[in-house]
Amino acid sequence: MEAFPWAPRSPRRARAPAPMALVPSARYVSASGPVHPQPFSSWNDYLGLATLITRASDRGSPHEGPGPTAAGPTMGPPEDDEDDDGEEPEAGGRYLGGALELRALELCAGPAEPGLLEERFAELNPFAGRAAAVLLGCAPTASTTAAAASTAEVTPREEPSPAWAAEPRLHAASGATAARLLKPELQVCVFCRNNKEAVALYTTHILKGPDGRVLCPVLRRYTCPLCGASGDNAHTIKYCPLSKVPPPTVRPPPRSNRDSLPSKKLR
């Protein structure tokens, strides 16, 4: 059996990574001495995410100086491969600089204006609509509206005004009116619905208008057999005024005295 001469392993593989030690500034550096285990702390940044975010933010804004934590020495873990491409850290830095640029976010740009969040989350409001100001008690009074108008004249804003600002007649609406505004205005004719008509027919109109006139086209063509009413005053026999009048009681004719006498037998 042929034996191969022993050859020493390459120094590249024989080199072991230096031990890592955690410094108080939450960065990893190589430690020459033995590492003493430390208790785990949930408030300690073991991964150094704060450093990455600070570097990315400082790299994206050249006018600002480096952060307070960027002044300390930072050393990453030793590289095991000496032939690594030197352009990878730059590419990673550019990626982090674009991905972690928090100042590019619209919400982090500065303090939000008073009406900005209201307009953004207006679609998520379950009471969005005409009656929202009445139910939630946020309808402005006359003095508030006048003050807002004067402020708008001094410092005009480009944002559109709320929907309830253009309708001052809702300010004095009662609770019943607010409840009615929340209900969907569906047109249902009870006469056609009770007669088993199609849904497409009885949802296009109502039975009677606010003034009491009959609006149903089917009922308007009907003529009451008792009173002959039709058109605006059309109704069925059940709702006819004559059907509610009790009929006169019929009394039997009075009996005569001759009929009251007992009959005699004829011989």
Curated annotation (Swiss-Prot):
A motif (C2HC 2) lies at residues 224-240. One of its GO terms (molecular function) is RNA binding. It is found in: Cytoplasm, Perinuclear region; Cytoplasm. Zn(2+) 1 binds at C189, C192, H205, C216. A motif (C2HC 1) lies at residues 189-216. A zinc finger (Nanos-type) spans 188-242. Residues 256-267 have a biased composition (Basic and acidic residues). Gene3D superfamilies: Nanos, RNA-binding domain (4.10.60.30). May act as a translational repressor which regulates translation of specific mRNAs by forming a complex with PUM2 that associates with the 3'-UTR of mRNA targets. Capable of interfering with the proadhesive and anti-invasive functions of E-cadherin. Up-regulates the production of MMP14 to promote tumor cell invasion. Not essential for normal development. InterPro entries: Nanos/Xcar2, Nanos_sf, Znf_nanos-typ. Interacts with PUM2, SNAPIN and CTNNB1. Interacts (via N-terminal region) with CTNND1. Interacts with DDX20 (via N-terminal region). Belongs to the nanos family. Signal peptide: none annotated. Zn(2+) 2 binds at C224, C227, H235, C240. GO terms for biological process: cell migration; cerebellar neuron development; epithelial cell migration; mRNA destabilization; post-transcriptional regulation of gene expression; regulation of cell growth; tissue homeostasis. It comes from Mus musculus (Mouse). GO terms for cellular component: cytoplasm; perinuclear region of cytoplasm. Residues 40-56 are annotated as: Essential for its translational repressor activity. Residues 78-90 have a biased composition (Acidic residues). Keywords: Cytoplasm, Metal-binding, Repressor, RNA-binding, Translation regulation, Zinc, Zinc-finger. The N-terminal region and C-terminal zinc-finger RNA-binding domain are both necessary for interaction with SNAPIN. The Nanos-type zinc finger is composed of two C2HC motifs, each motif binding one molecule of zinc. It is essential for the translation repression activity of the protein. This is Nanos homolog 1. Residues 57-94, 243-267 are annotated as: Disordered. The gene is Nanos1. Expressed in the oocyte. Transiently expressed in eight-cell embryos. At 12.5 dpc, it is re-expressed in the central nervous system and the expression continues in the adult brain, in which the hippocampal formation is the predominant region. Expressed in the seminiferous tubules of mature testis, but not in the primordial germ cells. Residues 244-255 have a biased composition (Pro residues).
